[in-house]
């Protein structure tokens, strides 16, 4: 006779899109691999129950059913409905891939998030393979801790405004584009610096020296007050995602190992601290959401067939990360980065489609000397600037140093292209949970 042993395997119909986020579950007996949503939801949602049938051994290795009916029927697992929007995911993946190839970057990522609900509409993580092609092998958006560089100036800005250390008219006078802390110097990217500039302009031009002066002088003798303010905005806590791999941010407290007299000045513009790209995006999303800090959401609901078994609602991390006044100032200054002719992202300006955000160009391996320095280019913000619907972060690691390296040149165009294509082709995506 014939005994059929059937097995069910899971396929990724949109592979390679979001393949690392969709993930997999693999049980090899001695070790279990849990990646992405499948890894996180396999045991209690996706995994079904085996059935039972009474069989009789007729000879070694051969069995026959005793009855035609099962003593216990197998039960399929539930279906998981994600928040990913296939069109937005396709746009994000293809746009990021094109720019990574253009700048021969080591890797890059892009994430699109719904401002009001926290729903992740797209997530692409691409790494260069040995043959110079790109594929998803690691979820850097969730798991990669990095120094965010100038994109952290938003956090420093809000802290200083909330603690009334400055206002937007406060003037900074760093000479020759450099600021000295003990025997170390912080430099502006513009040779010779910007002269005397106020805080609003310093944010638009992304002056490292102005922000170092603002935080180092403003919190002199009270470094713990600066870190306490960051902690009050939940910046030191992980997001608590339903998939494995998220790293907790590293924001040192005065007295911790690694803290020094240089720490305030370096933290002011995104060094000596570590965050994941998704943690940075969630904070910017809070500014777009008028201060309401919400948890990124990957899953809309669990279903069995057409029946909804469970819905996943928006989770609030902090109802208001700052005062309404401070949030409004931050929104205006983020728009100025793009709108003002002197803003670092002005080349992304389009009067018909305003976007708001912040550029970042962080150095890596700077401890090894100038010849070993590489760069991480980033842009994070939201669109449209005047009525935010989506927030987005783009991070590109190690673009070719012989080509463009700045956030406005490498990551910024990815953001703008995603924003324009998403808004042109998916105007009603908010109807999808």
Regions found by a protein language model. Give the residues of each.
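A helicase ATPase "motif cassette" and its flanking acidic/Ser/Thr-rich regulatory loops
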Residues: 92, 202, 415
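Short, gly/Ser/Thr-rich active-site loops of penicillin-recognizing serine hydrolases
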Residues: 308-316, 412-433
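Structural motif corresponding to the C-terminal cap of alpha-helices
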Residues: 95-103, 128, 338, 400, ...
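Conserved, well-ordered alpha-helix/loop/beta-strand core segments that scaffold catalytic motifs
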Residues: 65-108
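Small/polar-residue-rich segments within soluble enzyme cores
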Residues: 1-76, 394, 413
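Short, charged, low-complexity patches
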Residues: 34, 85, 89, 280, ...
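Beta-lactam-recognizing serine transpeptidase/beta-lactamase-like catalytic domain environment
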Residues: 58-71, 110-149, 155-398, 407
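Amphipathic, well-packed alpha-helical segments that form the structural scaffold of globular domains
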Residues: 46-49, 81, 93, 97, ...
């Amino acid at each position: 006779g014939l005994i059929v042993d059937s097995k069910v395997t899971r396929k990724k119909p949109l592979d390679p899109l979001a393949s690392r986020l969709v993930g997999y579950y693999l049980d090899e007996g001695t070790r279990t691999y849990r990646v992405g949503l499948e890894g996180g939801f396999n045991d209690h949602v996706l995994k079904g129950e085996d059935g039972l049938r009474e069989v009789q051994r007729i000879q070694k290795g051969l069995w026959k059913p005793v009855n035609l009916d099962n003593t216990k029927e197998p039960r399929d697992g539930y279906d998981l409905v994600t928040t990913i929007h296939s069109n937005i995911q396709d746009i994000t993946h293809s746009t990021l891939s094109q720019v990574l190839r253009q700048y021969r970057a080591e890797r890059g990522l892009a994430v699109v998030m719904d401002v009001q609900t926290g729903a992740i509409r797209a997530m692409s993580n691409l790494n260069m393979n040995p043959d110079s092609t790109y594929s998803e092998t690691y979820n850097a958006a969730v798991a990669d801790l990095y120094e965010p560089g100038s994109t952290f100036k938003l956090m420093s800005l809000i802290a200083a405004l909330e603690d009334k250390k400055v206002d937007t008219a406060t003037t900074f006078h760093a000479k020759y584009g450099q600021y000295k802390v003990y025997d170390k110097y912080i430099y502006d990217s513009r040779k010779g610096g910007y002269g005397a500039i106020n805080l609003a302009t310093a944010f638009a031009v992304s002056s490292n020296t102005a922000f170092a002066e603002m935080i180092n002088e403003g919190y002199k003798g009270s470094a713990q007050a600066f870190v306490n303010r960051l902690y009050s905005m939940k910046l030191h806590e992980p997001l608590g995602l339903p998939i494995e791999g998220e790293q907790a941010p590293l924001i040192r407290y005065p007295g911790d190992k690694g803290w020094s007299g240089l720490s305030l000045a370096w933290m002011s513009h995104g060094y000596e601290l570590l965050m994941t790209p998704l943690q940075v995006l969630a904070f910017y999303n809070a500014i777009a959401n008028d201060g309401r800090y919400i948890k990124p959401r990957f899953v809309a609901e669990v279903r069995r067939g057409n029946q909804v078994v469970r819905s996943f609602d928006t989770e609030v991390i902090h109802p208001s990360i700052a005062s309404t006044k401070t949030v409004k100032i931050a929104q205006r200054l983020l728009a100025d980065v793009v709108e003002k002719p002197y803003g670092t992202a002005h080349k992304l300006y389009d009067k018909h489609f305003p976007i708001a955000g912040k550029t970042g160009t962080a150095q890596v391996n700077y401890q090894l000397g100038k010849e070993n320095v590489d760069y991480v280019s980033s842009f994070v913000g939201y669109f449209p600037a005047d009525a935010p619907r989506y927030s987005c972060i783009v991070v590109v690691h190690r673009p070719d140093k012989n080509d463009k390296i700045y956030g406005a040149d490498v990551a910024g165009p990815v953001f703008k292209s995603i924003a324009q294509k998403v808004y042109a082709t998916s105007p009603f995506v908010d109807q999808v949970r």
